[in-house]
Amino acid sequence: MTKGILGRKIGMTQVFGENGELIPVTVVEASQNVVLQKKTEEVDGYNAIQVGFEDKQAYKKGSKSNKYANKPAEGHAKKADTAPKRFIREFRNVNVDEYELGQEVSVDTFETGDIIDVTGVSKGKGFQGAIKRHGQGRGPMAHGSHFHRAPGSVGMASDASKVFKGQKMPGRMGGNTVTVQNLEVVQVDTENSVILVKGNVPGPKKGLVEITTSIKKGNK
């Protein structure tokens, strides 16, 4: 069955494995995960849990009302006896019997050695050319060349008389939802609500990431 949790990417560091191997890891903090809703096949047509992450900022300290949450959001969170959440995600194909409304989902959901998929929003690079954005080759950089980093031909002449859709051209790069599959959980620190993931994960520091059981875990 699938397991899932939301967290924030803290950064990267290195740890030593049992055999002395130096392993690059990404530190993900995953606290304040609360089950907001349970969905069952009988009622909703599929099994899933809805998890909220991080409380929305209140209007003022000690106030019951929330500046950044409307009444539907407050009512939805109230059913789980919790505060309105900033991020809400749904995890399908889970064993809903293992979860209760308002239950906190902690990092011990995963164990050392688990194979996971991590989803995040890639770093935004702004407007970039075709070479950086799509990996196209450049022209000669000599003084006699008139073609250095230009994208080159984008289509045919009179036969088509247009540029086809999907042509790789300069444009906005990054800021896309990216999933890196088959990463290994190196360590789970329940005391600090931290998961160490082997390798790098998408997004900048403090970026939101979604950790789920690997959909291809049998392939590694």
Swiss-Prot record:
This is Large ribosomal subunit protein uL3. One of its GO terms (cellular component) is cytosolic large ribosomal subunit. Residues 61-81 are annotated as: Disordered. It comes from the Bacteria. One of the primary rRNA binding proteins, it binds directly near the 3'-end of the 23S rRNA, where it nucleates assembly of the 50S subunit. GO terms for biological process: translation. Keywords: Ribonucleoprotein, Ribosomal protein, RNA-binding, rRNA-binding. Part of the 50S ribosomal subunit. Forms a cluster with proteins L14 and L19. It holds the Pfam family Ribosomal_L3. The keyword Glycoprotein does not apply. PROSITE patterns: RIBOSOMAL_L3 (PS00474). GO terms for molecular function: rRNA binding; structural constituent of ribosome. Belongs to the universal ribosomal protein uL3 family.
